A protein has these predicted regions:
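Intrinsically disordered, low-complexity linker/terminal regions across diverse proteins
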Residues: 47, 259, 288-291, 314, ...
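Active-site-surrounding "flap" and adjacent substrate/cofactor-binding loops of secreted or lumenal enzymes
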Residues: 47-48, 61-137
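Short, Gly/Pro- and small/polar-rich lid/capping loops
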Residues: 42-57
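Short, solvent-exposed loop/turn elements at domain surfaces
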Residues: 77-81, 210-211, 510
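Noncatalytic, helix-rich "gating/capping" subdomain that lines the substrate-entry/channel surface
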Residues: 111-401
Length: 693
């Protein structure tokens, strides 16, 4: 699962793959009732992927569990899962993304096609979607919606007016999950690294049109070609918007962005929280980043009275500010014109949205726009349909067992000093875990959504989100502000604050079934949740205290002991060689593999706690212990091309799924459950099993 800490990769598009055998579940017909609530007209069928694995034929009972547990658990599924040529890999997580994508599409389109209460969530969601589907209205308006802002850009005549305009673009589009902003700086409101009581504005570098700073400065043929294509794209957009000399303007824009990129911090700095923690007072901007008229900038940004900031990449702020000082107003104005059109391309005529590659599928583009603009409105409707209160309660009960189990594990550790144990237990007690969806939703009642005004809807929504985030600067820190939306399959660990979140869309079969087998739930979703919990207490989690503040709480001896024990696991991982010429690099995947094992151990303890001394139930010829480990192995199944597997081994911090399932070989209970003995290929002598948590 994802735990971006303070930086994260951008999410990819949902794949749509009908050919895999488990995509057979029926979808409910959705309607909007008289109260404006989306409901299922037909009963939703049981999930296509059963958590009672023996019924599906996914296993291969001809394989001995102790020799190859992954193929014992998944051999049947692997045999019938053919990877289409257009895909490089496919797994259960991808299936959940597909499923959620279809569910979100259906509920948004249902909201758009049925009468609903004015001002209700269904009306806002449906009308936002409808406005993007109203191509006639969008084409008729042309570029008129941009006229006022284009006039403002044209009127920029000095550093002060340029700085003031740049301040208006400081929006809240970056956060713990989204590291990129298409504006010169990005804003995230969150607690400070050393202050858990006050929300602060975190400023991030932004404003580049290409994905990475290296795309601008790397001399490789691929980046040279990419820059040429980007310059041609800039020219095409400007020409469509009616600007003469578009090729010359495009060259100037690329030159400006290249100068900005040279000041950007490299991506490698994102992994070093101490490089991100740069508290600046308001006066520091004038002293450390001269050039920008910061008084005008922050006044326009709504931050005139804000005394404290966190600057994540000081070199970028200093470099961009210096570029404002240079006499290049026309270059800046062309840059702002291009990015204005680019930013709103999806709400502009088709010629522009097509050039911006946002019009391949109008309906899907409208769904994506709606989901992005009104995430918690869509999320609330999604939760009503697909994650009922009973499922949330059952998942929360499981989390309670996981916390009890982890508490006992910490108390019994031999390598952690007594003082560090005390701090670990305090951190565990303070850990906030959000399940499914927020207890308090964003209130959209003041936001007007108009059915025939796509551009206006975007602008009003951006203003709404900006004001909502600025208001948080005057509010106490809320550790359970959700960084992920219910309809997005995923899990997020936020070290600061000390909180973790698991969306409704990830807590679906086959990971979790609110009506399904407890042993399977604990072995799959339980192990995943415990995996994330363990990261709060590992070598990286050790630098954040119970309140999410920076501060190491391990002793030097604790660190040495942890590294000695985890080093043994790295050696075990080094032995995994899917190809004769390529083996896993144990150190590269160590952190995630330690968490996999910790999650499995804690989840097993929690499953035992859930039984409350009662006898296990037999299902499909398997007892609870067997189903627990089977579910763990089945969550890692994946079909993958050789090239994709080689790329994963070369650069990913996670083991290939086949080897992630082999964490069972370090768990004593697995040996008992499947009668694994010396001579079996996965057998590890008890004294050599990895024992960290």
């Amino acid at each position: 699962m994802d735990h971006p800490r303070h930086s994260s990769p951008q999410g990819g598009a949902f794949a749509f793959l009908k050919t895999l055998p488990f995509l057979t579940g029926a979808v409910a017909t959705l309607i909007v009732n008289a109260g404006g609530q989306i409901v299922a007209k037909d009963a939703i069928t049981a999930p296509a992927v059963s958590l009672s694995p023996t019924a599906s034929g996914d296993m291969d009972s001809s394989v001995k569990p102790g020799d190859d547990f992954y193929r014992y658990a998944n051999g049947g599924w692997l045999a019938k899962s053919v990877l289409p040529a257009v895909q490089t890999s496919y797994d259960t997580r991808a299936m959940l993304k597909e499923k959620a994508s279809g569910q979100v599409r259906d509920l948004i389109q249902a909201a758009a096609t049925a009468p609903s209460e004015k001002g209700g969530l269904a009306q806002k969601v449906g009308d936002y979607y409808a406005s993007f589907m109203d191509e006639a209205s969008i084409e008729a308006k042309g570029f008129t919606p941009l006229a006022d802002e284009m006039a403002t850009i044209a009127a920029i005549n000095n550093k002060t007016s340029l700085s003031a305009y740049l301040g208006t673009t400081l929006n809240s589009e970056v956060d713990g999950l989204t590291a990129n902003s298409d504006h010169v700086l990005g804003l995230w409101v969150n607690q400070g690294f050393e202050d858990s009581e006050h929300n602060l504005p975190h400023l991030w570098q932004g404003g580049l049109g290409l994905p990475d700073r290296d795309n601008y400065i790397d001399p490789s043929p691929q980046d040279v070609e990419l820059r040429a294509k980007y310059q041609a794209h800039i020219a095409a957009v400007l020409k469509l918007a009616g600007f003469a000399d578009s090729e010359t303007r495009a060259a100037h824009i690329l030159a400006l962005e290249t100068s900005m990129a040279r000041a950007f911090a490299p991506d490698s700095d994102a992994a070093d929280v101490f490089k991100q923690n740069n508290p600046w007072k308001r006066a520091d901007f004038d002293a450390k980043a001269p050039g920008m008229d910061w008084e005008s900038y922050f006044k326009s940004a709504g931050l005139a009275r804000q005394p404290d900031f966190i600057v994540w990449q000081p070199s970028a702020v200093t470099g961009i500010s210096a570029l404002v000082e240079i006499d290049n107003l026309n270059q800046w104005k062309d840059y702002l014109r291009f990015h204005l059109v680019e930013h709103y391309a999806s709400a502009l005529p088709r010629a522009v949205s097509a050039e911006a590659q946002r019009a391949q599928n109008r309906a899907q583009a409208a769904v994506d726009a709606t989901n992005g603009a009104l995430p918690q409105a869509v999320g609330q409707l999604y939760a009503q349909l697909y994650f009922p209160p009973a499922a949330k309660a059952r998942a929360e009960e499981m989390v309670g067992d996981l916390i009890k189990a982890f508490r006992a594990r910490i108390a019994n550790l031999t390598w952690l000093s007594p003082l560090s144990k005390e701090k670990a237990l305090a951190k565990l007690a303070a850990l906030e875990i959000g399940i499914g969806y927020p207890d308090k939703w964003i209130d959209y009642s003041s936001l007007d959504i108009v059915r025939d005004d796509a551009f206006g809807n975007v602008r009003r929504t951006e203003a709404f989100n900006r004001q909502r985030n600025l208001a948080r600067l005057r509010q106490p820190v809320n550790p359970i502000d959700w960084p992920i939306n219910p309809q997005i399959p995923g899990a997020v660990l936020m070290f600061s604050p000390n909180a973790e979140f698991f969306s409704a869309a990830i807590l679906q079969p086959p990971y979790f079934d609110g009506r399904g087998d407890a042993a399977s739930n604990y072995g799959s979703a339980g192990a995943g949740i415990a995996h994330e919990i363990s990261h709060s207490f590992d070598e990286l989690g050790n630098i954040y205290d119970a309140h999410g503040r920076l501060g190491t709480w391990w002793s030097d001896e604790d660190l040495l002991q942890f590294r000695a024990k985890s080093g043994k696991q790295a050696v075990q991982l080094d032995a995994y060689c899917p190809f004769t010429d390529l083996c896993v690099k144990g150190k590269q995947v160590l952190s995630e593999s330690v968490a996999d094992l910790a999650g499995l151990l804690v989840a097993h303890d929690a499953y035992v706690l859930s039984l409350k001394g009662k006898a296990e139930v037999m299902l499909g010829g398997l007892n609870g212990e067997q189903r627990f480990f089977l579910a763990f192995a089945q969550r890692w199944r994946k079909v993958q091309s050789e090239a994709a597997l080689r790329r994963q081994i070369a650069g990913d911090t996670h083991l290939p799924g086949e080897y992630r399932s082999d964490a069972v070989r370090n768990v004593d209970a697995w040996y008992n459950a499947y009668n694994v003995v010396a001579g079996d290929k996965l057998f590890v002598p008890p004294e050599e099993r990895i024992r960290i948590w």
